[in-house]
């Protein structure tokens, strides 16, 4: 996968100039590691307008910039109005390739925490609608999207392209509330087989799991997608498990004869379906979804107080409940993390080592958080 993604990158970037006004590269430090990302700002962003955010995660051996071009949402974002972030994974300890840790690797890299911290950083810097944050990805990025659905409440919906769920992920999925899910997968995928492999669930089992959790009808509506491109050597079927009441929808595009590829991609790397655009279908799916309550509302932290000394060299955190447990982290406006500590009850922290400048404290308790900005003299 690494070699063909490198070839794709060279083809796509030849003679290409990125607009500095549209794409921002950034770094944050999480769990002692410096992490990088690319953030796409759509055209015609209006002052005061809050926009949705799509996390677009690369596959094994790839990176954020390659995924930005291969699984491309940028023209859609310009028209529909949403932000896109393309984060970078870390090097796999044995393979030496970029990857996402979906809970089965011994490296201990906290990718779930990184993506949540990245969301916190971006939402502090940009006008993001936190009720419309979505996660999608290719291959290993699709696995990571499922991992986020199982272990985070920050996303309104997820979509996987050529990804699946590991058996431990499915068996230990911590989610109890419905979340809209889309899976796009080729039946001739030799990297992540449609019928599963050792330690990886089949797509049928993945769909069964989410339709049960989401409380959708067990019999889907099946639509044969019009074969508009007879030269792509594959066809598509669209399976729809609709939502009713408090349930959440599940959709699946089954690419008959399709390979380990992103449908609609401008470069064919293996058998690539051109009857649909995965990016357009994913955004259609995401755009009809909104969390009923804003993510990470401050319920439970409303009465938490933060008191600074005159020169902001110390800060005292006073929760409503003296037995409250929470995590406090300090960041600068570029997202660099200076410390992260777990505290119980009223606590005072020294900020002497911080250089003069603007910072913010993020305080987490269970699944809620608050952010406080301050200036260190």
Task: Specify the residue positions occupied by each region the protein language model found.
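Residue-level detector of functionally pivotal "anchor" positions at catalytic/ligand-binding pockets or at interdomain
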Residues: 290-314, 320-322
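C-terminal tail/sorting-segment detector
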Residues: 316, 356-377
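Short beta-strand/loop motif that positions the catalytic acidic residue
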Residues: 183-185, 189
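A domain-start/cap signature at the N-terminus of enzymes
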Residues: 18-53, 79, 83, 136-159, ...
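Bacterial Sec-dependent N-terminal signal peptides
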Residues: 1-22, 295-298
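Serine-hydrolase catalytic machinery in alpha/beta-hydrolase-like enzymes
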Residues: 24, 28-38, 44-134, 147, ...
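Glycine-centered tight-turn motifs at strand-turn-strand junctions
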Residues: 24-33, 337-354, 367-368
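Short, glycine-anchored, charge-dense loop/turn motifs used at functional sites
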Residues: 330-338, 359
């Amino acid at each position: 996968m690494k070699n063909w993604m490198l070839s794709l990158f060279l083809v796509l970037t030849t003679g290409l100039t990125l607009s500095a006004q549209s794409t921002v590269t950034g770094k944050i430090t999480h769990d002692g590691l410096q992490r990088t990302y690319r953030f796409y700002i759509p055209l015609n962003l209006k002052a005061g307008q809050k926009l949705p955010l799509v996390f677009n995660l690369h596959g094994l051996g790839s990176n954020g910039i390659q995924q930005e071009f291969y699984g491309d949402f940028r023209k859609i974002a310009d028209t529909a109005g949403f932000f896109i972030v393309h984060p970078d994974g870390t090097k796999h300890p044995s393979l030496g390739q970029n990857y996402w840790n979906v809970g089965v690797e011994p490296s201990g890299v906290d990718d779930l925490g990184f993506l949540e911290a990245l969301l916190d950083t971006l939402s502090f810097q940009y006008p993001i609608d936190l009720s419309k944050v979505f996660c999608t990805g290719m291959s290993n990025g699709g696995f990571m999207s499922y991992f986020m659905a199982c272990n985070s409440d920050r996303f309104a919906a997820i979509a996987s392209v050529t990804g699946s769920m590991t058996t431990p992920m499915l068996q230990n999925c911590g989610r109890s509330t419905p979340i809209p899910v889309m899976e796009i997968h080729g039946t001739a995928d030799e990297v992540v087989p449609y019928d599963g492999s050792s330690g990886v669930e089949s797509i049928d089992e993945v769909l069964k799991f989410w339709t049960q959790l989401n409380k959708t009808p067990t019999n889907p509506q099946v639509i044969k997608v019009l074969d508009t491109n007879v030269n792509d050597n594959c066809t598509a079927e669209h399976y729809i498990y609709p939502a009713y009441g408090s349930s959440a929808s599940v959709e699946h595009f089954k690419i008959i004869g399709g390979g380990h590829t992103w449908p609609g991609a401008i470069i064919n790397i293996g058998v690539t379906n051109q009857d649909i655009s995965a990016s357009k279908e994913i955004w259609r799916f995401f755009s009809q979804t909104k969390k009923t309550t804003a993510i990470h509302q401050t319920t439970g932290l409303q009465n938490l107080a933060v008191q600074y000394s005159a020169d902001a060299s110390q800060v005292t955190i006073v929760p409503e409940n003296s037995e409250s447990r929470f995590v406090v982290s300090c960041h600068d406006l570029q997202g660099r993390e200076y410390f992260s500590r777990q505290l119980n009850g009223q606590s005072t922290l020294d900020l002497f080592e911080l250089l003069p400048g603007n910072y913010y404290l993020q305080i987490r308790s269970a699944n809620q958080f608050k952010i406080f900005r301050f200036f260190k003299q």
